[in-house]
Amino acid sequence: MTQCASRRKSTPSRAILGAFASARGTRWVATIAGLIGFVLSVATPLLPVVQTTAMLDWPQRGQLGSVTAPLISLTPVDFTATVPCDVVRAMPPAGGVVLGTAPKQGKDANLQALFVVVSAQRVDVTDRNVVILSVPREQVTSPQCQRIEVTSTHAGTFANFVGLKDPSGAPLRSGFPDPNLRPQIVGVFTDLTGPAPPGLAVSATIDTRFSTRPTTLKLLAIIGAIVATVVALIALWRLDQLDGRGSIAQLLLRPFRPASSPGGMRRLIPASWRTFTLTDAVVIFGFLLWHVIGANSSDDGYILGMARVADHAGYMSNYFRWFGSPEDPFGWYYNLLALMTHVSDASLWMRLPDLAAGLVCWLLLSREVLPRLGPAVAASKPAYWAAAMVLLTAWMPFNNGLRPEGIIALGSLVTYVLIERSMRYSRLTPAALAVVTAAFTLGVQPTGLIAVAALVAGGRPMLRILVRRHRLVGTLPLVSPMLAAGTVILTVVFADQTLSTVLEATRVRAKIGPSQAWYTENLRYYYLILPTVDGSLSRRFGFLITALCLFTAVFIMLRRKRIPSVARGPAWRLMGVIFGTMFFLMFTPTKWVHHFGLFAAVGAAMAALTTVLVSPSVLRWSRNRMAFLAALFFLLALCWATTNGWWYVSSYGVPFNSAMPKIDGITVSTIFFALFAIAAGYAAWLHFAPRGAGEGRLIRALTTAPVPIVAGFMAAVFVASMVAGIVRQYPTYSNGWSNVRAFVGGCGLADDVLVEPDTNAGFMKPLDGDSGSWGPLGPLGGVNPVGFTPNGVPEHTVAEAIVMKPNQPGTDYDWDAPTKLTSPGINGSTVPLPYGLDPARVPLAGTYTTGAQQQSTLVSAWYLLPKPDDGHPLVVVTAAGKIAGNSVLHGYTPGQTVVLEYAMPGPGALVPAGRMVPDDLYGEQPKAWRNLRFARAKMPADAVAVRVVAEDLSLTPEDWIAVTPPRVPDLRSLQEYVGSTQPVLLDWAVGLAFPCQQPMLHANGIAEIPKFRITPDYSAKKLDTDTWEDGTNGGLLGITDLLLRAHVMATYLSRDWARDWGSLRKFDTLVDAPPAQLELGTATRSGLWSPGKIRIGP
C-alpha cells in the first residue's frame, strides 16, 4: 500500500500533464530568452569599449622647463625622444641634463628613469642603470651630428645618433631588446631653459587601458542580457506554476515548517516573519552597539581609499599596489562603496552594508534556516540562542568593517535558503535565483566560492528535480534560464572593462603576489594560532567554535543514522557547505585569516544544530555531554592563549591588547585548561561508572546547552573590551568615541593627533642666574657637563627610524642626506637635527664617542616655564639614544637617564620639587631621534622652571644619549594643519581613521602629487605599508620616492602621549615644476585589444 501510494503521489496527474503540454509558448520564451541572455552575457567581455587616451608631449607651451606627470602605471606604453645636436652644442662646458623622466636627485633615479646627460667629455643615454649609448662630446658637437633619437617600447630601448658612424662605418646606434627597460616616468626634467629649440621633442603614450567606458553596442548588449535573463526567469517561474501547487512567490515567502506542523493559510508575510522575540532584540541591539563601539576589520582603510579614488579615476583601481590595475573580475561590491562616498566618508555610514548584512543573516537564520533543520531545532530556544551568540561572536572580529566577508556570508546563506526552497517544493525558479546569488557572491571576491559550495551541496537533489521536469517540458526550457542566471554576473564584472584588461590585471596580481599555491592552505590556520592580531582571542573563537560544532555534528550524525525531529538532508547539506568551502578556499590566491568571516552565518546555523545534537534528548549518556563540555573548555583555553588584540586603532585602550589576559597573575587560558582537565577527567570517570551516574542537577545544567552560554560569554567579553577601551581612553581617541563624534562632524584620528608646525618656536628662555658659569655647551650643558660634546651623535641617526642598508621604500630624505652640516651650529655642532630644528638656534649635546668611554652627566640650566594652558599641554625634549622611559606598547623600558626636573619658587633660588620620567615611544628605534614627552598635567600648577638632567653611566659604546633643550610646543590638530583639500598619501592601513583627509587622486593614467603622507605606527609602517606600497610592486611609493623628499613631522596623540599612533610626513618637491598638460583623446577598442604587458620585471 505504501509503495503504491508513493508511486501515485510522484506521478503527474493528467491535468498537470495537460498544463505542461499547453505551455508551448512559455517553453519557447524560456529557451530563447535564456539563450539570448547567456550569449549576450558571455559576449560582454569581448565587446568594444571607448578608451580615454593620453599623450605626454614636451616641451610645453614652447618653453623649456621641467614638468611633472607621475604615471600611475609607473611606465608608459612607449616613449620617444628627439634631441637636436645643436642643443648639445649650446650647453655649457660642464654639461647638464638634457632630459630625464625623473629628477636626477630622486631616490634611485638612475635605477628607474631614462636620462640624456651631457658631461664635460661625453653624451650618455642611460636607462634604468643601463648605458644605452655613450658618445664622446666632441663627436656630438661636430657638424656631422644631426640629432639623437631615443625609443623605448615593448620591443626594447634603443638610441641612435643620426649622422654619426661607428668604427665600422655603420650608423651609430645601440640598444637592448628588453621590454623591462621601459623607464619610469614622473615627468620630464631638464637643466635647459628658455624657448624650445626646433626639433627637440619628447612623447610618451600613457597607459590608460583601464580608463574605459562601454560603447553603445556594449551598453545595449548589457541591457539586453539583463532583460533577457529576467524574462527567462519569469518564464521558468510560469513553468513552475503549472504543477498546480500555487504561486512561486508564495512558496518563496512561505516559512519552512516542520513536516509535522499543520498547514495554514498562505500569507504574503508569513507569521514567523512578523514575530519578535527576546533573541531578536538581543541580536539587533548587539549588532547596532557593535556598529558604534566595535572594532573594524583589517583592510578598511585600503578599501575606503579605493572607493574614494574610484569616481575621479573612472574605474575601481587598486592604486596602493599593482600599477593601478582594476579589482575586476572581483569587485562589484567596492563600486557600491564608491557610490556611498558621495554621501559621506564617515565610518558609521560606510560600514552600513555589513551591518545590514548581519541583520538580514539573523532574520534568515531565525525564520528560514533553523526551522528547515527540523522540528527539534525549530522548537529549541537554546538552539536559537546558540545561533544568535555564535553569529555575533563570528561577526564581531571579522565583519564590522568594509571587507566583503559579511556580504559573502549573506550571499552564501541566501543561496542555501533558495536551494532548500527548491528542494522542498520541487521548483526550479528558487534554484535559478540561487545560481544568480551564488554568481554575484563569487563576483564579490574569490572567497565567494562558499556560495558555489552551497550549490554543489544541493546539486544532486536539484538534478533530480531537473530530470523530473525535463520529462514534462524538455531540457532547454529549464537549462537555458539557468545558463543565463549563472552568466549575467559578467555584465556587471565587464561593464566597463574588457576580457583583455581583466586578464592583464589578473596577470599583474598573480605575478606580483601575494598569490599562493593551493597546497599552502595550511598557512591560513598557522596564522590563526600565532600570538598576533590575526591569531587574537576574538578571531580564534570566531572560527574555532564553528569548526568544533561542525566536527561534533558530523560525528554524531554518522554514529546515529536517524535522529528524531532533525532533518538529515538539510543538516548534511549545511555541513557540506562548510566542508566544501574549506576545500574551495585552498584555491584562493591569498591565505588571510580574515577570510574566516565568511563562515559567520553558516557557522551560526551549525551551532544551533549542534546544540540540539548534544542536548540530553539526543545524547542521553552524561559521559558524552561532559566530553563535549571538555572540548569547549579546551577550545576556550586555546582561544585565550593569545592576546586580546584588535586591528590598528581599534585596540586603543583595550585590556590585554598586546599580552595574554591574566587574573591575579594567572593566565585565563590556564584557568580554562584546568577546567578542561577536570571535565575530561570526570568524563573518563563516567565512562567506567554506571550509566545512570552523573545526571545530577549541576551536571545536567552544565551540559544541557553549553554552546550558547560559552558564545554569550565571549560576546560579552568582546563588548566589555571595547567599552573598557572607550572609558580608559576618554576623552582622547577610541574607536567608539570617534564614531559618536562623527554625528557632529568629527574627523576621526585627525582631531586627536596634534602637529607641531614649527619646532623652533617653543623653546624656553634659560634663566641667566648662572650664565657666567655655563660650560662650553651653553645653557643646555649647564655648569659642569661631563662627557657630553656638541657632536656626540653617530652618523645616520635619523628621526623615528633606524637606518638599514639597503634602504626600504618610503624612507625619509634624512636617510640619504649629508651626515654633517656645512657650517657648525650654535654650539659648534655639525650634526644634522631632525624635525626641522634649526642648528643655528638649537644646541645639541651627546655622549657618543668612538674613543675611551666614560660616565657622563649633564644638568642643564633652568628654563622659564610658561604658565599652563590647554593649548600647550607638553614639555618636549628632542633626544636620541637608549633612554629609560614609558610607552603604551612596551611599558617601562630601561636605559640611560634623561629626566625633566621642575622647580618651585623659593625664598631665594629655585627649589627643585621633583623629576619626571619621559613618555618615550621607544618601539623598535631606541637609538633614533624622537621627542620625549612630559605632560604638563603631571607637574604642579605652580612649577615655574624646568631643566634637563641626563646621565649616561654605561661604558658600553652603544649606550649613548643625546639631548636638545626643552620646549613647550605650539600644537594644532592634524585636521587643522592638513585640512581636507590638500592631497595626502594615506597609507592603506589608516584610511578609515582619517576620513576627512583628501587622498591623492589619479585620472587618465596620471597621479596627483601629494603634499603629506600619513602612516600607521612604526612597526606597521615598516612591515606592512612600506613594503606593500613599494614601487617594485606597482605601489604609490614608487612615485613619491622618486619625485619628492619626505620629512617626518613632530606629532603627538592628544592625552595619550606615550602611544605611537603613526606619523605625518611632509613632502617637499625635488624640482619645482608645474603639472604637465596632457593631450587627451578617445579610441574604440575591442575586447581583445591590448597595448602590451605592463612592465613588472626588475
Curated annotation (Swiss-Prot):
Enzyme class: transferase
Membrane-related topology note: Multi-pass membrane protein
Listed GO MF terms: arabinosyltransferase activity
Cellular component, GO annotation: plasma membrane
Pfam families listed in its UniProt record: Arabino_trans_C, Arabino_trans_N, Arabinose_trans
Family: Belongs to the emb family.
Name used for this protein in its record: Probable arabinosyltransferase B
